[in-house]
């Protein structure tokens, strides 16, 4: 049974209504404001977690108690509830006020000036907000995001338990392994020169649970990756709904999340409509070709068309020898200034330029690169299926660059054109059949594209053919899948490779032999040699999910105590230097410190 009444209060600041008029009550909270309107007469606002209540000071003794208090002091007030003369319909407590008879200061605010106005903290500089996060969180708007996070996590936990999953925690101190991002390392005092790693994900542990005979596992798992921040990615640590199922394939995983997520999104989201099950399945290659992204926003009805054959030889320099992609928009009413901004935004986000022309109501090619398109108008109109009044946005470059730029262009145009985007809904889809391998941007060598523990389509046979040169490794797809909602990647998952022979063969293609696999993944390799069930899983990002539900653009808005973009905790002063004694105990010598870098 929930109770809000404590030793310090009989009611909360969001609780009092007309039925309480005439009662003597005790409230406790933060002094949000005091406004003097006459001699010994003032209005005060008391705020707690639950709401605000107006307090009316009407005598000298009470005014003396309030007069010397700074905003944000915590006080206990005992007084009588009465009906307001001037009601405030915007507040749940707007029909009443409290006339205090006794005031006790519980925690005095010793600062005459606050770093920012509490109720407008979101307008303040982010560094100030993060340094004084305990003040920022007093803002109801900021606080409500954290409440939403708690509600969503509770709903996810209940849903998974109802589906027969067991919540099992896995180790935080583990071994370093090559999972993609940089590890956070923890030195061992007892074993000089050796290090633990904070887990990038519970990947190996959850697979080992399946090998141990558990059927369904989940946890709200902390994950640690030393990677740069983005708007939808927090540096350092994040949380995911980690889950795994034994004797299951990807359709079994899909069925669980398709049952769990839509009602949670409809209940807690900004929008009340969520796409029903089954979610649409889109192959990775189709997504890149038609949407220019492996996380397409399906609320936008625009698609990408290949225009290489139609425009590659039009004489426009950037198109020559490159892939050309087009996004055709009907009913476009943007001005030249707005078009220029759209193109500039595409270049900033994708690193590639965007181009354009119109097919006007008179059937003429005008604007942008029209002079290059006009001579081949009929062929272009036919190839792109243009109707009079169309706007055509274009990108060009190597295949992947042109695709990604077109994806950004599609998103920008969709957001700009209300008739092409149904914003007020949650549109889910599964992206499937990801490439198993890719050529690394830095190494120029074959690398795993996503999860190295995924089962390849074609199994051992396709890997052996690739090793023999009979199949291009880049053509191999894996049983890997992403869950996407409104253009946000919520989760990645896969059918796991549970056969040690297939595991070794998969790693050999990226220049790691059987001995390397045994050395880097000893527990999992050995466990699988004892027989392991086919298993599959997924791990939706909790932070990213709540960000989407809250309608926020920055993931820091839904994390109680986030780091800044430079992976610094400004409130706690982390990372920080430690004492020489601590370093000596760990047998660590620092060869370079941050001041050295600043001096260079």
Label the predicted regions.
Residues 1-600:
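Class II aminoacyl-tRNA synthetase catalytic cores and aaRS-like
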